[in-house]
C-alpha cells in the first residue's frame, strides 16, 4: 500500500513538474520578428481632416437644435484623437456628452418607410405621402442638416486613427432623413411642373452618396453608401418606369443621375487597407490590447494581473501582426485586379486565408489569442469588394435602361442594344453583355455580393 502511494506521489510530482516545464517553455517562447512589410504597411501616417470635412457634420448630426453640428463633430473628433494620442482607454469616451440636452433620438424599433428589396418604393412613398410629409415637417431642422452634408467636398474619414473602441456615427437618423427626401422626390414627380425640382434633388442625392463612397476609407461607411446608393438607383429606375417621358424632357439631369460608376470612383482597395491597418493595429498597443485580449479570452481567470500574465504567454503581438498582414495582403492584392479575376481567384483566396487562421495545435500552443483573434476575421473578404462591384453593375443597368428609353428601342431590339454596348456597360464578372429576358422584360447580371439581390436587375416596365 505504501509502495503504491509512493508511486502515485511520484507520478503526480512528475506530471506537475512536466506541466510546470511546459508552462515555462510556453511562457518563455520569444515572439517572432515583426515582418518589415507589415511594419511599413501599418506605419502609414494619417492625414489630418480638412476643416470642411463632411464627417464633422455626420458626427454632430444629432446634436441639439441650438448647437452647430459641424462644431460638435469637430469637438468629438478632437476629443477622440486626444485620448488616443495619450494612449488612454477609449471605453469611457461617450459621444452623447457632446450632443446637448435635446439631441435627436430614433425609436429602437424604427423601420424604413419602404423595403426596397420587396416593394416599389415610388408607389409606397405615394401611399405614405401624408405620414412622410408630417415627419418631414417635424424634422425640418434635421432635413436641412442632411441637405447641408451634400455641400461638402471632402468626405474622407475624420478620425486620425480608429481602434476597436472607436464609436460609429449615428447613421440611423441620417438614413431616416434620406428616406424623407426620397418621399419628397416621389411626391414632386406626380406633378409635371415640379418634376425638374424632383430630379435635381435626386441628382444631388446620388452625387452626395457617390462622393461618400469614393471619399471615405471606413469599410462600414462604404457598405452604408452602397446600400443607400442602391435605393437611390432603384427609385430612379421606378421613376423611369412611371414617367418615361422625363428621359427626353430632362436629358442632362437623367444622364447625370444614371452615369455609370467606374471602379476608379470607388475606394475598395483603400478601405480594405484601412480595415487591415485598423485590425492589425489592435495588436500594436501592447498594454491596452493585451489587457483587452486577456479580458476577452480569459475572463474566468481571477484578477486582472493573472489574466494579463496569462496573456503574456498566450498572446504574441508580432506573430499576430504578421499573420494578420498576410491575411489582408492577399485580399488587397487580388482586389487590384478586375472583378472577373477576383471572382476566378475567390476560392483560392478563401482557402489560403482559412489556412492562415486555422487553429492548429502548434499555432494554439504558440499564440492562441492571436490565432483565435485572426480566425474571427471573415474568411471571404471578397464579399465586400463584390458588393461594391454589384453597385457598379447596377449603375450600368440603369444607364442601359435610360438609353433604351431615350432611343425608343422596341422590345425585340433590346438584345441587339445590349450586344453592341461598350465595355463600360458590360457585366463586370463575365465581361460579356448583360442578360436579357424578354418574357419578364428584365436586364440583369449575376450579383456576387449576395447582400442586395435587387442590384442585379432592372425591368423595362415603361413598355405597357
Annotate each language-model stretch with its function.
Residues 2-464:
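Short acidic linear motifs
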Amino acid at each position: 500500500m505504501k509502495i503504491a502511494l509512493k508511486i502515485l506521489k511520484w507520478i503526480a510530482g512528475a506530471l506537475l513538474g512536466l506541466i510546470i516545464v511546459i508552462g515555462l517553455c510556453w511562457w518563455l517562447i520569444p515572439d517572432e520578428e515583426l515582418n518589415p512589410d507589415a511594419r511599413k504597411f501599418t506605419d502609414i501616417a494619417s492625414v489630418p481632416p480638412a476643416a470642411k470635412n463632411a464627417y464633422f457634420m455626420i458626427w454632430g448630426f444629432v446634436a441639439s437644435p441650438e448647437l452647430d453640428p459641424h462644431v460638435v463633430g469637430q469637438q468629438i473628433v478632437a476629443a477622440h484623437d486626444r485620448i488616443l494620442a495619450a494612449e488612454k482607454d477609449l471605453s469611457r469616451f461617450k459621444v452623447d456628452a457632446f450632443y446637448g440636452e435635446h439631441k435627436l433620438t430614433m425609436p429602437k424599433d424604427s423601420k424604413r418607410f419602404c423595403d426596397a428589396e420587396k416593394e416599389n418604393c415610388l408607389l409606397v412613398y405615394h401611399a405614405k405621402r401624408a405620414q412622410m410629409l408630417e415627419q418631414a415637417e417635424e424634422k425640418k431642422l434635421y432635413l436641412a442638416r442632411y441637405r447641408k452634408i451634400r455641400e461638402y467636398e471632402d468626405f474622407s474619414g475624420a478620425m486620425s486613427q480608429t481602434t476597436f473602441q472607436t464609436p460609429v456615427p449615428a447613421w440611423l437618423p441620417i438614413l431616416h432623413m434620406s428616406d424623407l427626401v426620397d418621399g419628397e422626390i416621389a411626391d414632386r414627380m406626380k406633378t409635371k411642373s415640379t418634376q425638374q425640382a424632383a430630379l435635381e434633388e435626386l441628382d444631388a442625392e446620388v452625387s452626395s452618396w457617390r462622393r461618400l463612397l469614393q471619399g471615405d476609407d471606413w469599410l462600414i461607411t462604404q457598405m452604408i453608401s452602397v446600400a443607400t446608393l442602391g435605393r437611390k438607383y432603384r427609385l430612379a429606375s421606378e421613376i423611369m418606369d412611371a414617367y418615361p417621358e422625363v428621359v427626353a424632357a430632362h436629358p442632362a439631369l437623367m444622364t447625370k443621375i444614371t452615369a455609370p460608376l467606374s471602379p476608379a470612383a470607388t475606394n475598395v482597395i483603400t478601405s480594405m487597407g484601412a480595415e487591415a491597418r485598423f485590425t492589425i493595429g489592435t495588436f500594436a498597443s501592447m498594454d491596452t490590447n493585451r489587457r483587452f485580449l486577456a479580458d476577452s479570452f480569459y475572463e474566468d481567470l481571477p484578477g486582472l494581473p493573472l489574466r494579463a500574465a496569462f496573456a503574456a504567454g498566450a498572446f504574441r503581438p508580432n506573430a499576430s501582426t504578421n499573420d494578420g498582414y498576410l491575411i489582408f495582403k492577399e485580399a488587397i492584392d487580388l482586389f487590384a485586379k478586375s472583378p472577373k479575376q477576383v471572382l476566378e481567384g475567390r476560392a483560392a483566396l478563401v482557402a489560403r486565408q482559412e489556412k492562415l487562421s486555422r487553429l492548429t495545435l502548434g499555432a494554439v500552443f504558440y499564440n492562441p489569442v492571436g490565432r483565435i483573434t485572426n480566425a474571427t476575421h471573415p474568411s471571404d473578404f471578397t464579399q465586400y469588394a463584390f458588393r461594391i462591384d454589384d453597385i457598379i453593375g447596377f449603375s450600368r443597368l440603369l444607364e442601359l435602361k435610360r438609353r433604351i428609353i431615350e432611343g425608343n428601342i422596341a422590345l425585340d431590339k433590346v438584345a441587339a442594344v445590349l450586344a453592341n454596348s461598350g465595355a463600360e456597360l458590360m457585366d463586370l464578372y463575365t465581361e460579356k453583355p448583360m442578360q436579357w429576358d424578354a418574357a419578364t422584360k428584365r436586364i440583369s447580371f449575376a450579383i456576387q455580393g449576395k447582400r442586395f439581390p435587387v442590384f442585379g436587375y432592372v425591368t423595362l416596365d415603361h413598355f405597357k
